[in-house]
């Protein structure tokens, strides 16, 4: 690999609103998300707890965009892996800039936990080995597949890896 640098963003946060999905002329899906990440700390002078929230614009493409539009809702917790991009445009003679996290087919969008307003029937499977179970986690070995390999048309509110589904991985290690 002859990369001159690394451009990788990892976020774990909650959606500020429902995803906005649109389709571009070639038929591909594009979803826009607003993801909030927060950090909290104790103020050394006052002893009060403080919190700072950052809002991130996330753009998903392809099947990931379709899955986000179908299953993600405001308040849902998500894990995002993508690339940071800044684009510019002209707005009546004023150059405007926006920085976004792009999640292409090589990126990852993983649903974590459940949204606060969901009922008990839509709860995810419990965590195993500290890893949340989602459509990106395979049954064997906890190996992770890329988001583009997920199946978008699953009837459950939050898709889970079907029991017994074979992804072509073997438990036999050749060494």
Curated annotation (Swiss-Prot):
Any one GO molecular-function label of the UniProt entry: single-stranded DNA binding
Composition bias, Low complexity: 115-136
Spans annotated as Disordered: 114-175
KW NAD (keyword) present: no
Every SSB domain range: 6-110
Biased composition (Acidic residues): 163-175
Matching Gene3D superfamilies: Nucleic acid-binding proteins
GO CC term, one of those recorded: nucleoid
GO BP, sorted A to Z: DNA replication
Classification via InterPro entries: NA-bd_OB-fold (IPR012340), Primosome_PriB/ssb (IPR000424), ssDNA-bd (IPR011344)
Protein name: Plasmid-derived single-stranded DNA-binding protein
Organism: Escherichia coli
Gene label: ssb
């Amino acid at each position: 690999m002859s990369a001159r640098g690394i451009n990788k963003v990892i976020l774990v946060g909650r959606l500020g609103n429902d995803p906005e999905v649109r389709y571009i002329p070639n038929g591909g899906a594009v979803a826009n998300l607003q993801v909030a990440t927060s950090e909290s700390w104790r103020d050394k002078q006052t002893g009060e707890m403080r919190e700072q929230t950052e809002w991130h614009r996330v753009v998903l493409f392809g099947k990931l965009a379709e899955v986000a539009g179908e299953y993600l809702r405001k308040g849902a917790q998500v894990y995002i892996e993508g690339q940071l991009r800044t684009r510019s445009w002209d707005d009546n003679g004023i150059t405007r800039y926006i920085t976004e996290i792009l999640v292409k087919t090589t990126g990852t969008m993983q649903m974590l936990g459940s949204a606060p307003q969901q009922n008990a029937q839509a709860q995810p499977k419990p965590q195993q080995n500290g890893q949340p179970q989602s459509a990106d986690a395979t049954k064997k070995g906890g190996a992770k597949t890329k988001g583009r390999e997920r199946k978008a048309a699953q009837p459950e509110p939050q898709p889970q890896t079907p029991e017994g589904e074979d992804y072509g991985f073997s438990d036999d290690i050749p060494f």
